[in-house]
C-alpha cells in the first residue's frame, strides 16, 4: 500500500555535530526485510565518520548539495543528482562542500 512519509515523521540518529542519519524505513513503523532507506545530512564543510557494510551493496543518491565521497582511497566528486554504487566491504566516508550534502541511501537486505 502506498504511503507518504513526512519529514517530521523521520527520527534523527545524530552521530557527530553537523552530521545526521535519518531512517526513512523506521518512519513507516514496520520492519522491512527487503530494503532499508536512510537520509544522510551533512552541514557545510563536515567530514562524516567512516563506514563499512560487509554484507550489503548500497545505492547513494545526492538529493542536494556538493562534496566528496572517499571510497577506500579514491575520491569521487558529488553534486546534486549524483548516483554512487558501493559494493559490500568498501570503506567510505563523506566530506561536504560549502553547500552541505544530503544523500538518500538505499540498501537491499
Q: Where in this protein do the model-derived segments appear?
A:
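A short hydrophobic beta-strand segment most commonly corresponding to one strand
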Residues: 39, 85, 99-109
